[in-house]
């Protein structure tokens, strides 16, 4: 079984400039998602899709493969899944995957054990899609696990599941401050 993670990371963040590479716990924010995917026992390959050369260089430094995103797919009004689709279409030219994960660059609290547990839940329950939610069951966008054909799906499946993963979706300096004050380091 081949499982790939795709981390969408555009350079045009508005509320927190350079959000995806903003330092948190002494590292670029995106590095936490890349490390979690690399440390996963189930994820085979990690891709970052970006139009930003600085993000690409940092992601490559942390071991991710890079998909050079069309700048049109990095505009404010573009839905994240458009970038995921474009990246997966590129990957499909070389090989197919059994599971595709959209992994958020700005959820630095995500860990390999959480990802592995969510993937196992997805597979065990034979879902088409599994989305991360917070403790109030509200989507937090930390990850979205999908069957490869679901990357192209436009409608919600009746075989969608949720996985409780209480992480902060970082968009502001206040979010960064909250995480750093609430969790002295990533391992607390």
Predicted regions and their residues:
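Short beta-strand scaffold positions
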Residues: 49-50, 170
């Amino acid at each position: 079984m081949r499982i790939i993670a795709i981390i969408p990371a555009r350079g045009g963040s508005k509320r927190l400039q350079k959000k995806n590479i903003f330092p948190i716990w002494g590292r670029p924010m995106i590095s936490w998602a890349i490390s979690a995917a690399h440390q996963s026992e189930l994820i085979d390959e990690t891709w970052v899709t970006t139009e930003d050369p600085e993000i690409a260089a940092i992601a490559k430094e942390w071991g991710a493969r890079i998909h050079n995103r069309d700048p049109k797919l990095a505009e404010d009004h573009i839905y994240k899944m458009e970038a995921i689709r474009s990246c997966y279409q590129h990957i499909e030219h070389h090989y197919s995957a059994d599971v595709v994960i959209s992994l958020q660059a700005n959820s630095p609290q995500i860990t390999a054990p959480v990802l592995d547990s969510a993937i196992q839940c997805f597979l065990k329950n034979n879902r088409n899609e599994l989305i991360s939610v917070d403790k109030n069951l509200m989507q937090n966008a930390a990850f979205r696990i999908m069957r490869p054909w679901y990357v192209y799906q436009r409608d919600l499946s009746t075989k969608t599941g949720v996985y409780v993963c209480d992480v902060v979706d970082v968009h502001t300096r206040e979010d960064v401050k909250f995480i750093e004050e609430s969790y002295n380091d990533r391992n607390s």
